[in-house]
């Protein structure tokens, strides 16, 4: 049956619109009186009904391609489209009532059914997939009507488009109780799914929070208030195409890409400190042949500024610096301006979403850099800084480093219930120029569900370091600039949806 499906798919992509696997039958011959069977694959002629005369299978070409902004039409007959306004654009006909809600160029770019070409079922499925990425559409439906053209039988295509609701708003309210301190938070979000009539999605969210803090004690004389306030705003604009100047339209049509610009700002004011967090990003995502995924972060800016820390809070952070360096790192000024690219490949393709049935492997790679353009620009403006001084932007020294990671995993299927998985991961990061060490969140660490699972996150240091005499651990012994992961895991299905695993791991960082 697999061979019949393969041949059917091949013929349907070569213009044979009405072909299906029922026209392919096998004949078995055992007349030679052996243990072998001769199989002959026969092609039956086209016959719609048993009483019809058999005839050759016809090859169809696409005639007209029409887009209709109406999903309620059950069939297209003569005069059906007379009540619609129409527009002719680059050989395609657009029909709509009132105003067109999508630009004609968008429909042409996302369509794969071309007038004058042989009918292809793959082109139809690709068109469905492309239109499904347009958030301005609720759904789409493609129908064909057989007509007699100049060069034989043709198919006119009708692409029906159901408009989605463009605008939506959401309001959220929540109450909090942190160790007896009562508070409340509220947020309002707005989304527009078709800002420029190209299915661009714009989102904006505003959030505010308040909490009354009690029990500040004698240290309260160093505090400016006795409550916690937070407010923030974030927004994003998503394009369903690869938006970049100087790229040809053919390139944009080949890849299923999205482009996104994002901005975020948050201000936090507590008795102990004030903190400002801001970020900006411009990124691209695209897939290739359903197995490969790409992400390009053209620019990704993360900014943390601490304009105020009380002396009591600073003393607390200093006392915790050796016990919990991650806590202290969260309350330090930071500026990272990075560019990165990541690549993911899975040999199973869409099958990875189901229970694996055969051997497969996956590859993940990532490379990023930060601060190089800022460093060059700073050198041009101020070529000779004082000894020991770092270049700054917005009064914060910016990070400068390069980092690369590579992960490979191989899945060996023993049977449908049991498998072995082998994994190796390597990574290296190097700070230089304006940085003497990596930003804390960019360092490698061990422990946790995605690392050596026998230890909790960041609890496993390199080598056999035992810490200081009082048992405290310094951050440099819990994170590193190089990593090496090795993992062998046996997986088995126990019962229902419960799976079990036994693993052996080694990690250096």
Role assignments for model-derived ranges:
Residues 2, 9, 19-21, 185-190, ...:
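Extended beta-sheet lipid-handling architectures
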């Amino acid at each position: 049956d697999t061979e019949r499906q393969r041949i059917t798919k091949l013929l349907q992509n070569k213009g044979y619109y009405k072909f299906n696997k029922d026209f392919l039958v096998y004949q078995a011959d055992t007349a030679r009186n052996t243990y072998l069977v001769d199989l002959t694959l026969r092609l039956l002629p086209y016959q719609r009904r048993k009483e019809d005369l058999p005839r050759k299978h016809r090859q169809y070409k696409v005639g007209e391609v029409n887009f209709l902004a109406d999903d309620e039409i059950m069939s297209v007959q003569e005069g059906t489209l007379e009540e619609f306004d129409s527009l002719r654009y680059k050989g395609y006909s657009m029909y709509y009532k009132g105003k067109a809600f999508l630009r004609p160029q968008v429909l042409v770019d996302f369509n794969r059914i071309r007038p004058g070409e042989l009918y292809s079922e793959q082109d139809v499925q690709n068109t469905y997939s492309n239109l499904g990425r347009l958030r301005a559409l609720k759904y789409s439906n493609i129908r064909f009507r057989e007509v007699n053209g100049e060069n034989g039988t043709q198919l006119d295509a009708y692409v029906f488009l159901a408009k989605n609701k463009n605008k939506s708003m959401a309001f959220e309210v929540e109450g909090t109780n942190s160790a007896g301190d009562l508070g409340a938070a509220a947020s309002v979000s707005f989304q527009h799914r078709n800002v420029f009539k190209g299915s661009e999605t714009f989102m904006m969210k505003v959030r505010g929070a308040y909490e009354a803090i009690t029990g500040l004690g004698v240290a309260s004389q160093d505090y400016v208030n006795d409550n916690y306030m937070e407010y923030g705003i974030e927004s994003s604009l998503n394009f369903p195409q690869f938006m970049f100047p100087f790229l040809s339209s053919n390139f944009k049509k080949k890849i299923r890409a999205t482009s996104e610009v994002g901005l975020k700002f948050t201000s936090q004011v507590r008795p102990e400190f004030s903190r400002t967090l801001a970020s900006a990003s411009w990124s691209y995502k695209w897939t290739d042949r359903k197995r490969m995924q790409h992400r390009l972060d053209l620019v990704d800016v993360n900014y943390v500024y601490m304009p105020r820390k009380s002396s009591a809070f600073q003393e607390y952070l200093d006392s915790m610096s050796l016990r919990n360096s991650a806590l202290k790192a969260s309350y330090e000024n930071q500026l990272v301006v990075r560019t990165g690219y990541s690549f993911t490949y899975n040999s199973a393709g869409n099958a990875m979403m189901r229970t694996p049935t055969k051997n497969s492997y996956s590859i993940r790679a990532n490379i990023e850099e930060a601060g190089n353009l800022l460093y060059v620009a700073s050198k041009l403006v101020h070529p000779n800084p004082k000894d020991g001084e770092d270049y700054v932007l917005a009064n914060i020294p910016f990070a400068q480093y390069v980092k690369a990671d590579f992960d490979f995993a191989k899945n060996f299927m023993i049977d449908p219930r049991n498998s072995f998985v082998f994994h190796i991961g390597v990574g290296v990061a190097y700070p230089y120029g304006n940085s003497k060490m990596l930003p804390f969140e960019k360092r490698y660490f061990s422990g946790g569900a995605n690392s050596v699972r026998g230890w909790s996150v960041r609890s496993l240091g390199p080598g056999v370091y035992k810490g200081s005499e009082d048992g405290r651990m310094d951050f440099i012994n819990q994170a590193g600039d190089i990593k090496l992961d090795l993992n062998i895991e046996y997986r088995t299905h126990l019962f229902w949806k419960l799976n079990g695993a036994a693993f052996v791991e080694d990690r250096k960082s």
